Structures are given as C-alpha cells and as structure tokens.
Design a protein with these regions (language model features):
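Active-site-adjacent betaalpha module
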Residues: 2-15, 49, 61-188
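A short alpha/beta connector and helix-capping loop motif
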Residues: 11-12, 28-57
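Short hydrophobic beta-strand that contains or immediately precedes a catalytic carboxylate
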Residues: 17-19
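Active-site loop/turn elements of alpha/beta-hydrolase fold enzymes
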Residues: 21, 58, 137
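Short acidic, Gly/Ser-rich segments with clustered Asp/Glu that frequently serve as metal-coordination loops
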Residues: 23-27
Length: 188
C-alpha cells in the first residue's frame, strides 16, 4: 500500500518556517541548546531534501538577525530572513507572498517563542487552510510552563505536534533513498 496518512509530512508539500531565532530571545529561552540543535537538524534536513525554508526575524533593527548557529546551516535557496513587527508571521505581507510562492500546503514550524509568535503564526496558518505541524522540541519559550501552555493551545486548535526527529523521518519516508545516509549522520 503506497498511500500515506494525510497528517504525515511529505517533502514535496512541506515548507519549513523558522521563527525569530535571534540572540535577544535565545539569551533567555528555556533549553536553548536543545532548541538550537533541533532547529539546526530541521534546517539541515530541509537543505538535503530540497525543502523550501522561510525564516523570520522580529524587529531586526533592534533585535538583530538570525543567530549564526542557524544562518550557517540554511540552504542556499532559503530567503533572506523576513523582518516583521507583527507577532504572527502570517500577518506580514512579505511572509504571505513567500508562502504563496512556494505552493506548499504543509507548514513545519520551529523557533521562538512557543506561546507568542509560534502560536499566533500557527493559528493564523490553520485558519488560512494550511496543515500546520510544530516540532515541539524545536520551539521554546522563556519558561517551561509557557512552552507547555503554548503547545497545549496549539494541539487544542488543530495544530499537529511532533518531535523534530519524527518530522525528519516523515520527510525521508524510507531508508532506501540517496539522501538517507546524509541525514542519518545528523540524527546519530
């Protein structure tokens, strides 16, 4: 049987969105190392599997750009980080245009903060008809409680939570493809 469940990520229909991975946020974020490692894993997987990536930054003039740990692993096809002032990425015209240009219907979200920008973006994207997945171990907030509350709200609102590694294996689909060995090195 070749048909897969529609809630599984598919590399031909998925877009990776990396939200606000900037130093001022990460300086105070809960489990920064875990968060950064998992966002890197998703970005590297996207590069290997040719999955489009859109990154955002919140108020770059004041908060700066993406941290090097993330920018250095982005695929060359990734757009320059989109600067925004609104908390929901979906309210940015530039983000909406980038999303539409990809033609992708599944959105895999990661970044910060779970209960603010990630949640507002995810909820707006669900409202717009996208299937939204949030890698629960590739998002975080300043406290574990805020992260947990954000994830509960997302799940209750129709967003699909997953682990970053689970997302990677869904995007791979099988071990018998050429990219498998490259990605296996990332998860081992």
């Amino acid at each position: 049987m070749k048909t897969r469940h529609p809630n599984l990520l598919d590399r031909t229909t998925t877009l990776l969105v990396i939200v606000d991975m900037q130093e001022p946020f990460l300086n105070v974020i809960h489990e920064r190392v875990r968060l950064t490692e998992n966002v890197r894993l998703l970005a590297q997987t996207a590069a290997i599997l040719n999955i489009p990536v859109v990154c955002t930054v919140q108020y770059a003039e004041r908060m700066g750009g993406l941290v090097p740990e993330i920018s250095e692993v982005l695929p060359s096809s990734a757009l320059m980080p989109l600067d925004k002032l609104c908390f929901s990425c979906a309210r940015s015209d530039e983000f909406a245009a980038s999303l539409t240009a990809t033609g992708r219907q599944q959105i895999l979200l990661c970044g910060v903060e779970t209960h603010i920008c990630v949640s507002q973006t995810a909820l707006d994207l669900v409202h717009l008809g996208f299937q939204v997945h949030v890698a629960a171990d590739a998002v975080s907030s300043r406290t574990q409680e805020k992260h947990k509350l954000g994830m509960e709200r997302l799940r209750d609102s129709g967003v699909l939570p997953c682990a970053a590694e689970a997302a990677v294996y869904e995007l791979l689909g099988e071990a018998g493809i050429p990219e498998f060995k490259s990605i296996l090195k990332l998860v081992k």
